[in-house]
Every structure is written in structure tokens, then in C-alpha cells.
Amino acid sequence: MNPLKKKEKGVGISGGKDSLTLLYTLKEILGENRKIEIMGITIDEGIKGYRDESIKNARELCDSLGIKHYIYTFKEHAKEMDEIMKNTRSDPCSYCGVFRRWILNKACKELEIDVLAIGHNLDDTVQTLQMNIMRNEPLRIARFRPSGGIVENEDFIPRIRPLFNIPEREIVAYALYKGINFYNSECPYAGQALRNPIRIFINNMEKDYPGIKFRMLKSYLSMLDTIKIPEKMKIEKCEICKENSSNKTCKRCQFLKELRNS
């Protein structure tokens, strides 16, 4: 990497409390550094009455901070969630997560972004950990790191999660204190997702056993060094979209094929 080249830092922003707090804080910390430019990237999943509203909050903060804001859509690069959910009873987060990650990586490459910051908080982290354990997906546990990943490749833009150990309620308190105008409604498909009962379970455990979320996080971090990663993970180019994939066809293109045939 050219040390004289200006560094581009992307922040994935939905318009919610976590991503806008992250954007605000990074701007406070890095805003005077002329060698670093911060950009906001929003993914519009095509959920009417939800994402179209939260985008307004994302745009408002970017404008007030003087940050460039880019919007990428499922309609352009995948299929809108409202259309998907008309024809399937599957976990909506499965489709949404795959499409969003694919689009974010593509957006970062197009915008020449060096690092992408994501607003996952402590609650998100332990919920994701528990989901991956229940699905018996150790490699997903290994991939979901505070920074970086398990494979270094120039086509995979590194991600960082600066809020990974901060409880959701503290982020809400900070956002309110700073006067950050965030969108506070829940995704209309959240109740159909596996994450929802896991979130309820962990929150109930936290009430009965205060501090359990932090203990889960500590356990998760210790797992990272014990999960066996294949020495040479083969990275291929998807035969359809030509993006990086661990298989001949990436998950995004597999999903699109399934949806077309359903």
C-alpha cells in the first residue's frame, strides 16, 4: 500500500443508533486527519416503510458532518426483500445478510475504500456467536472478528467492528446525549428471523445473571485461537458474478438462482 496515498475509510450506515454513533465518533476522532477520508455507505434492502425512512437519518447525519454518502440497492444488485418475502418462509436474515455483505464488499472496491467499519455492538456479537454455534458453523465464528478475517485477499475489503464490546443500551444513551437523530423502528421481518428468539433468550439470561453477555464475549474471543482453520482455503472466482467465493458459485448467486426458480 502506498503510504502517501490518502486512506479511504468506509462506514456501513443504516440510519440506526449503532451505525450513526459509529460514524459520528469516527468523524470526531479522525475528522482533522487530512490523510483519511470517511465515507458513509447505506444498503437499501427494499423494505418499504422501514429502510426508506432510515435512509433519511443516515443522509441527515452525513450532510451535517460533511461526509460523502453512497446508497447501493438490493434492486440493482440482488432482489428486494419485500419481493423475496412474498414467496418464501425462510429466515429473512439469511438472504439479507448474504446480499448485504456482497454489495458492501463490491461498493468498497468501487469506492477504493481500504477498511470498512461496521456498527455491530456487544448484543449483536453474542447473538451472532450463539446463532453460529446452534448452526454448527465454526468457520462463521472465526470470520466474525473484531477486525480482519481469516483470509487475506485484495478482493476482500477488511472490516472492523469498533463497537463489538459496547452494550446496546450504552450506545443508545450516548447517541441521545450527543443529539444523534437515529431511526428507532425494528425491521418488520425481525420476528421471523432466528436471531429474534436468541436475542430474547440472551436478554432474559442477562436479567437473571448480570454480566453474562460480557462472559459470552470473553468465551468467544478465546475460541478464535482454538478453531482449526484450513491451512489453505481455496478462493475461487464465482462463475456467474466473478466475485471471490469459496465455491464455484457464490452464495449470493446461489440464492438468486433459487429465488428465480421458486
Predicted ranges, named:
Residues 1-146, 165-178, 250:
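ATP-dependent adenylation/nucleotidyltransferase module used to activate substrates
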Residues 188-192, 217-222, 233-237:
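Small/polar glycine-rich anion-binding or flexible loop at a beta-alpha turn
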Residues 123-207, 262:
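Catalytic subdomain that performs nucleotidyl-dependent activation
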Residues 201-220:
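An accessory alpha-helical subdomain
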Residues 69, 244-246, 257:
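Cys/His-rich microdomains that often coordinate metals
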Residues 224-234, 240-245:
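Short, flexible, mixed-charge glycine/proline-rich loop motifs
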Residues 252-262:
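Short Cys/His-rich micro-motifs in 6-15 aa windows
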